[in-house]
């Protein structure tokens, strides 16, 4: 059985990282139940294992944390829903296939956005979830960066709901120079975080049966 846990307050990224790592160890050693954490972070830039230092442009007083997830630099902050699925891909109802897992994450978020009338896309050689904002021009609305330890997943997905998009100017998001970033709010969708959470939980159950 899987449980969704919503953290009600802004959470420091370092605290979340320890929470994830501790829970991953429990799943590995004690066969603990799977969980999906729904988090909203205080402002932070995080760097994945493929980052380049020159992609950190002007971070000001926002902390920068170097993590073990895949990917490059991204921003987390208020108004962004960050989702951390801790799933055991070695369990009988899962598949020991990291590429398949990432495809399922992508499908999950695309379907969730579609519920709100947002047509989202995958773009070849560009990680994340994208929406068309102008003719032949796309903006990233969700970032993906995961890690797996002994087939247990952690880190995950961040979706911009009402995020302050100006903060992305402090980095080259995901190493994609001149790429645009958007949010549900910027696309004219104004919803409470709790409303979005209901949809992603419903859509999760369709993909990760």
From Swiss-Prot:
Record-listed E.C. numbers: 2.3.1.181
Active-site annotation: 174
Note: In the reaction, the free carboxyl group of octanoic acid is attached via an amide linkage to the epsilon-amino group of a specific lysine residue of lipoyl domains of lipoate-dependent enzymes.
PANTHER family: LIPOYLTRANSFERASE 2, MITOCHONDRIAL-RELATED, OCTANOYLTRANSFERASE
Key word Cytoplasm present: yes
GO cellular component: cytoplasm
Catalytic activity: octanoyl-[ACP] + L-lysyl-[protein] = N(6)-octanoyl-L-lysyl-[protein] + holo-[ACP] + H(+)
InterPro entries, A to Z: aa-tRNA-synth_II/BPL/LPL, BPL_LPL_catalytic, Octanoyltransferase, Octanoyltransferase_CS
MF terms (GO), sorted A to Z: lipoyl(octanoyl) transferase activity
Protein name, as recorded: Octanoyltransferase
GO biological process, one term: protein modification process
Positions bound to substrate: 69-76, 143-145, 156-158
Organism: Rickettsia akari (strain Hartford)
Gene that specifies this protein: lipB
Location of the BPL/LPL catalytic domain: 30-209
């Amino acid at each position: 059985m899987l449980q969704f846990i919503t953290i009600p307050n802004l959470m420091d990224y370092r605290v979340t990282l320890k929470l994830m790592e501790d829970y991953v160890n429990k799943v590995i050693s004690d066969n603990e139940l799977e969980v999906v954490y729904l988090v909203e972070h205080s402002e932070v830039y995080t760097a994945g294992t493929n980052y380049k230092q020159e992609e950190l442009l002007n971070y000001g007083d926002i902390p920068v944390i170097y993590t073990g997830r895949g990917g490059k630099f991204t921003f987390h902050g208020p108004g962004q829903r960050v989702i951390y699925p801790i799933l055991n891909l070695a369990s009988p109802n899962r598949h020991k296939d990291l590429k398949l897992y990432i495809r399922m994450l992508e499908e999950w978020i695309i379907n969730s956005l579609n519920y709100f009338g947002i047509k989202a896309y995958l773009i070849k050689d560009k990680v994340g979830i994208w929406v068309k904002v102008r003719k032949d021009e796309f903006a990233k609305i969700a970032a993906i960066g995961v890690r797996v330890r002994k087939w247990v997943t952690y880190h995950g997905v961040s979706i911009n709901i009402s995020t302050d998009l100006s903060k992305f100017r402090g980095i080259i998001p995901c190493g994609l120079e001149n790429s645009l970033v958007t949010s549900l709010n910027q696309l004219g969708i104004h919803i409470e975080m709790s409303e979005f959470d209901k949809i992603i939980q419903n859509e999760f159950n369709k993909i990760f049966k």
